[in-house]
Amino acid sequence: MAKVWQFSEAEELFHLPFLDLLYSAQHVHRENFPHNEVQLAMLLSVKTGGCPENCSYCPQSAHYDTGLRKEPVMHVEKVLEAAKRAVELGATRFCIGAAWRGPRGKDLDIVCEMISRIKKLGLETCASLGLLSYEQAVSLKAAGLDFYNHNIDTSQEYYSKIITTRRFSDRIETLENVAKAGLKICSGGILGMGESNEDRIKMLVELSHLSFPPESIPINKLIPIPGTPLAEKNAVDPLDFVRIIALARIMFPKSYVRLSAGRESMSDELQTLCFIAGANSIFYGEKLLTSANSDPESDEKLLLKLGLLREKSKTAVDCSINLGS
């Protein structure tokens, strides 16, 4: 059973001497995962822009003028083409995101078709669609969804400073609905929004208090987007970022810890420290929803230099096969 952490013990770990913290995190990582493997996940926006939420970091919010063009839901065949490309590139997980407060009516039916078709490729499936009821989560599970992503973003105390169109408790309720439906949870946060290290630690503690803690934890570095309220925020301290990666690894020993948004601005050295600290998953590909991602060729070179191997798919399928609908 996963440990329920208290703030004081998590804070004590965070403030360990840096090398001691990384040593502990790497030890935990090696006890629970193949220590030279990295999971490659790919992310596709299947409905872009026009979101009614006012998340201060997000270029897809209808509240801000970021120059982003609103686009309708993608055709299923286009999504399937992207998923096949993901298999060819060596990804083992394919994530779809939609700029909604939550899916409605036929939108959920379309997403369910996407998921069932992607699943036939042998990929793990993940979706990020906003707030979700238990009944909607059950439908996604029946379609073959493995993971549901719903980041809590930051601590409960800091949450209202970055989002006011929904409550922190709404996020938790969706995560509980997802878990109750039998889906695995993917949930993490964003660093660099003006929050303190205390907020970052509390975010991880909150995740440990869920009925079913996340099996996948994305840690994002803020990408300041012109036109959003956080456009001028200062970058997070790199060593503090590594400390949070290490803390996530120790607190959630059996969960994937993913380097997510913001990796395109990280040096090879910073990413290497994150891998030492226990990160074992990255978003791969040129784009993350609407933002630039690290260049795939640069990723290949870094993984080769570090001797890191791609995690192998357990259920890979020949993409030349006609998978039907």
Swiss-Prot record:
<keyword id="KW-0004">4Fe-4S</keyword>
<feature type="domain" description="Radical SAM core">
    <location>
        <begin position="36"/>
        <end position="254"/>
    </location>
</feature>
<feature type="binding site">
    <location>
        <position position="95"/>
    </location>
    <ligand>
        <name>[2Fe-2S] cluster</name>
    </ligand>
</feature>
<dbReference type="GO" id="GO:0005506">
    <property type="term" value="F:iron ion binding"/>
</dbReference>
<dbReference type="GO" id="GO:0051539">
    <property type="term" value="F:4 iron, 4 sulfur cluster binding"/>
</dbReference>
<keyword id="KW-0949">S-adenosyl-L-methionine</keyword>
<feature type="binding site">
    <location>
        <position position="58"/>
    </location>
    <ligand>
        <name>[4Fe-4S] cluster</name>
    </ligand>
</feature>
<dbReference type="InterPro" id="IPR024177">
    <property type="entry name" value="Biotin_synthase"/>
</dbReference>
<keyword id="KW-0411">Iron-sulfur</keyword>
<comment type="pathway">
    <text>Cofactor biosynthesis; biotin biosynthesis; biotin from 7,8-diaminononanoate: step 2/2.</text>
</comment>
<feature type="binding site">
    <location>
        <position position="186"/>
    </location>
    <ligand>
        <name>[2Fe-2S] cluster</name>
    </ligand>
</feature>
<dbReference type="Pfam" id="PF04055">
    <property type="entry name" value="Radical_SAM"/>
</dbReference>
<feature type="binding site">
    <location>
        <position position="55"/>
    </location>
    <ligand>
        <name>[4Fe-4S] cluster</name>
    </ligand>
</feature>
<dbReference type="InterPro" id="IPR007197">
    <property type="entry name" value="rSAM"/>
</dbReference>
<keyword id="KW-0808">Transferase</keyword>
<protein>
    <recommendedName>
        <fullName>Biotin synthase</fullName>
        <ecNumber>2.8.1.6</ecNumber>
    </recommendedName>
</protein>
<feature type="binding site">
    <location>
        <position position="51"/>
    </location>
    <ligand>
        <name>[4Fe-4S] cluster</name>
    </ligand>
</feature>
<comment type="function">
    <text>Catalyzes the conversion of dethiobiotin (DTB) to biotin by the insertion of a sulfur atom into dethiobiotin via a radical-based mechanism.</text>
</comment>
<feature type="binding site">
    <location>
        <position position="126"/>
    </location>
    <ligand>
        <name>[2Fe-2S] cluster</name>
    </ligand>
</feature>
<feature type="binding site">
    <location>
        <position position="258"/>
    </location>
    <ligand>
        <name>[2Fe-2S] cluster</name>
    </ligand>
</feature>
<dbReference type="Pfam" id="PF06968">
    <property type="entry name" value="BATS"/>
</dbReference>
<keyword id="KW-0001">2Fe-2S</keyword>
<keyword id="KW-0408">Iron</keyword>
<comment type="similarity">
    <text>Belongs to the radical SAM superfamily. Biotin synthase family.</text>
</comment>
<dbReference type="InterPro" id="IPR006638">
    <property type="entry name" value="Elp3/MiaA/NifB-like_rSAM"/>
</dbReference>
<dbReference type="GO" id="GO:0051537">
    <property type="term" value="F:2 iron, 2 sulfur cluster binding"/>
</dbReference>
<dbReference type="GO" id="GO:0009102">
    <property type="term" value="P:biotin biosynthetic process"/>
</dbReference>
<comment type="subunit">
    <text>Homodimer.</text>
</comment>
<keyword id="KW-0479">Metal-binding</keyword>
<dbReference type="GO" id="GO:0004076">
    <property type="term" value="F:biotin synthase activity"/>
</dbReference>
<dbReference type="InterPro" id="IPR010722">
    <property type="entry name" value="BATS_dom"/>
</dbReference>
<dbReference type="InterPro" id="IPR013785">
    <property type="entry name" value="Aldolase_TIM"/>
</dbReference>
<keyword id="KW-0093">Biotin biosynthesis</keyword>
<dbReference type="InterPro" id="IPR002684">
    <property type="entry name" value="Biotin_synth/BioAB"/>
</dbReference>
